[in-house]
Amino acid sequence: MGVPSSGQVSINNIVSEFGGTEPHQLSEYYRDGGSVPGNNTNVPTSGEIKLSDFYGAVNSVVVTLSAPATNVELSSTFGSDWTSTIPKVLNIDSGVIIGATNFNYALRVSTGMAGTIEINNAGSIQGKGGSPIGQKGFHPGNRGNQTPPRAGSGGDGGPAISIVSAGATINNTGTISGGGGAGGGGGAGQRGQTINGRWKGGDGGWGGLGEGYNQARTTGTAGQRNQAYALSRGGDGGPGGYFGAAGSTGSTGGQARFKAPSSSAGLGGFGGAAGSAIKNDGATWTNGTTTGTYQGSY
């Protein structure tokens, strides 16, 4: 509720807001002295202190994010108050996007927090979408190994919120979205063989991108047809996942018209995992209001 912002202020108003031990005296209530948080800048840290210094003082640190931001580290946002037991409140305004440019988090409840934090999200918190991290399916050489290796997997999507410290309550009336996983690469086509020798099949396609902050979801690229003697086509890359969804496995390569002995088409790569809306990275949390949208586990 806070101390009155005008009119008469008594020691009882201050005790009601900040607590303390009897007998009460104003010297208990210096700013950053353990009872009064640093956001109450009118309250001195030492020296003369008077009742009127406490007009509008509140026993919590409130930060509001009203503009877009990326990779928000709450220990930096709250500064020295992060390691204080003073309650903390983070408000994210409607229409504000908090995004991830790395695969770790868009917003992180950092290590070392003391006390509690209440996160009130009315905006949109978006994890990073996955990218293909391995090769599309291919044959290492024109002749040699009969069966190509499995195509590379798609990268995982990143979480929207990472929880490292306990004591967080998350109220969501907006949207919290983990990144989508990338699609796996398409498998290489089966080797062919004719009287002229063995011939490699076509390369597989690349996996698609997962949906994420500043990244649209894409489908995989098509597999290629290679040597005329093989007449086998590489498999298509798997499409990336939407926000909070896994990428798809790439397609297996096609069969050759004239198959080389003991040869098989290459397998498609696995799709990347979905990013969590809220992820336990060492600590649990409490879901408060959940009337908003979640894309990914929470």
Predicted regions, residues:
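Glycine-centric low-complexity repeats
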Residues: 2-298
